From Swiss-Prot:
This is Gonadotropin subunit beta-2. Pfam families: Cys_knot. Belongs to the glycoprotein hormones subunit beta family. SMART domains: GHB (SM00068). The lineage of its organism: Eukaryota, Metazoa, Chordata, Craniata, Vertebrata. One of its GO terms (biological process) is ovulation. Glycans are attached at N41. It comes from Trichopodus trichopterus (Three spot gourami). GO terms for molecular function: hormone activity. CDD domains: GHB_like. InterPro entries: Cystine-knot_cytokine, Glyco_hormone_CN, Gonadotropin_bsu, Gonadotropin_bsu_CS. The gene is cgbb.
Amino acid sequence: MTVEISKVFVLMMLNLFLGASSSIWSVAPAAFQLPPCQLINQTVSLEKEGCPRCHAVETTICSGHCLTKDPIIKIPFSNVYQHVCTYRDLFYKTFEFPDCPPGVDPVVTYPVALSCHCSRCVMDTSDCTFESLQPDFCMNDIPFYY
């Protein structure tokens, strides 16, 4: 009799633990309707200090949703890493500005994504801020008042 009660108790505790652990890490229902992390074509504005105009180029970037879990119950001293859609493989292309004045190096390089994946943000190579500048934004388009 005690063996059966202990089996039932263990099964109830296991069920309680598994049920609770799934509710600790909740996923928003809308997350499954967002586009996944993938390559997309994007127009990007290139600019170079000393050159008068921006130039638009077509490139591939990583964009989309990565499934991320945020714990409802916060555990002290534990790290929660949010995953972002970022480059897996990339190469750099070179562009030469046609209208730079003499003495200004007209060459600039920009990344072209070859593949993407969900990973922690590497701030050295990616902009993982919540609201960053749009890829086709150009500083030269902002009027300066002196």
